[in-house]
Amino acid sequence: MSLNYFDIMVLDCLCKINGERSGSAVFHLFKGKRSSQTIQDAGLFQTAKYFGMAAKCSRSDISASLDKLEKHSYLAPMSESDTYKVTASGAAVLRHALSERPWPVHCHGAHYQQAAGVLWKRLSLLVQVLSHKQQGSRQYIPVTKDHKTLHWVKKYLSRHTDHIEMAKSLFAMLEAHLKKIENKAAQIFVYSLTSHHRIGYTSRQLADTLKEDEWYVYIMFWASVHYFIHSLPECEDALLKDLLSDVHLDNALTESTRKTWQMVKQGFPIQRIAEIRKLKTATIEDHIVEISLHEPAFMINDYVSAEDQLQIAEFAKRMRTNKIKQIRDGLEQRFSYFQIRLALTKQVQQYD
């Protein structure tokens, strides 16, 4: 029962969480659940790169992985249900696995995965359509059934009528970008495309062909798509910009949090934002914690003083914990849960 890359992802998350969240938290992270708790945990425990990166996994997939890791003695169950500590042998296996198959450098779920899904559907369909047009073929099954994607590509092709020139531009753009990433990742990306001549390979087919772990192939594929988005700010390619022109690239915050963020920037206090938006004060506090995690320039001193931040951070460091209740009780309940959570957002590099 050897470990696959999915197991390594689970093990790495549990190592970073350090017994402070359950296996269910890993499930929600991998699924990309856009709840305040999951998004905050992703920032607090430095696991945001995994956000949404295994969206099709099931609870049984997580359970099977946890069982496997426990049977190998890489995890030790804790007294609290569904929580685990990574053992010394588990940490050693994790280090070795990540040295052999490191997480791809530009692959970041919280930053890019939502936009990457849109980009891939549009790009892969555009490649397929242009390939068939060049061969004079009108009979084929589109690579996606997604109506929004089908409509977008149809509209785009109707606005740009020189399809031969478009195909050349698309080829040049893909070639230029793929030269800048690892050869294997570029190969995986290219073989995932469907053209007039062949159907794109699945992750399993590519894993068999490349003699590689299927989950690692899957991650490397998405890493190649993420690189296109990562390079967008410096990119001068009109076609790539067009493919993402209407896609919101700042995916770290939930939509509701973005609305709160706009009001915070206008100087509204928490209570007033809650009244205007007809939301609970606790919900607005959740939003502010999210904002603090994902907006480095956001100052929290209006909510918790610099001196109080230091006290909270020093206690958390001394006790090696991010558990809010433990910190609050240890500091004799001088600070609210909100203040402690907020102070910890500025300490997210610690205690991995």
Curated annotation (Swiss-Prot):
UniProt cross-references to Pfam families, sorted A to Z: HTH_40
Keyword Cytoplasm: yes
GO cellular component labels: cytoplasm; nucleoid
Cellular compartment(s): Cytoplasm, Nucleoid
Keyword Endoplasmic reticulum included in the entry's annotation: no
Main location: cytoplasm
Keywords on record: Cytoplasm
Note, other: The stop codon of ypbB overlaps with the start codon of recS, suggesting they are translationally coupled.
Quaternary context: Interacts with RecS and SSB (ssbA); the 6 C-terminal residues of SSB are required for interaction with YpbB.
Designated name of the protein: Protein YpbB
